Amino acid sequence: MKAFLGALEFQENEYEELKELYESLKTKQKPHTLFISCVDSRVVPNLITGTKPGELYVICNMGNVNPPKTSYKESLSTIASIEYAIAHVGVQNLIICGHSDCGACGSVHLIHDETTKAKTPYIANWIQFLEPVKEELKNHPQFSNHFAKRSWLTERLNARLQLNNLLSYDFIQEKASKNELKIFGWHYIIETGRIYNYNFESHFFEPIGETIKQRKSHENF
């Protein structure tokens, strides 16, 4: 089994290369960023951010969903983990990372009949959190039946929805308003490796390099 062989390789070689780092993490962690992404196997947070163990606090679920405050009881695990990262671990940044070819977002365009819901009731219940995206798409000026364009738009609207959902929580809004927590929305394109960041002022997703240039010009980034 590949996972077992990989674990052995890690123990005998890769661990040794970062032994001092792992030893320093024995009794503490101080990640700088809370990274919320999809469970998709093609999205590897530490790989796409170039970070080492101890730098990211990662939460993954189907569709990188953050239920709004009005529905928090339906996803206690997610919001409890977010609260822990912010209130106790003290992360300084929060990134919502959507991605291309997202199955959860793609399901927005499918007809969910009762038979399908009966076969996978837990998935059907979770996907309901994406209903606002479906409604927004109906009259969106950029909506297209072209599969790739439609997928990207859906994924980006979902990332924006999840950002808004996060800000419905007082403890997150308070940290953000004091500039103690910086919040970002990403759209990662699997086949090209490109990452786009949501611009809260223009309401568009821009190449991540543009975001870095803008922030470097007026703050320590």
UniProtKB/Swiss-Prot annotation:
Q: Does the keyword Glycoprotein apply?
A: no
Cofactor dependence: Zn(2+)
Its recorded reaction(s) are: hydrogencarbonate + H(+) = CO2 + H2O
* Keywords noted in UniProt: Lyase, Metal-binding, Zinc
Query: Per its record, what are the GO molecular function terms?
Result: carbonate dehydratase activity; zinc ion binding
Q: Domain of life here?
A: Bacteria
SUPFAM superfamilies referenced in this protein's UniProt entry, alphabetically: beta-carbonic anhydrase, cab (SSF53056)
Provide the cofactor note recorded for this chain's UniProt entry.
Answer: Binds 1 zinc ion per subunit.
The keyword Metal-binding is annotated on this UniProt entry: yes
Q: What is its EC number?
A: 4.2.1.1
> Which PANTHER family does this chain map to?
CARBONIC ANHYDRASE
Q: Which family does it belong to?
A: Belongs to the beta-class carbonic anhydrase family.
Q: What is this protein called in UniProt? A: Carbonic anhydrase
Name the gene that codes for it. cynT
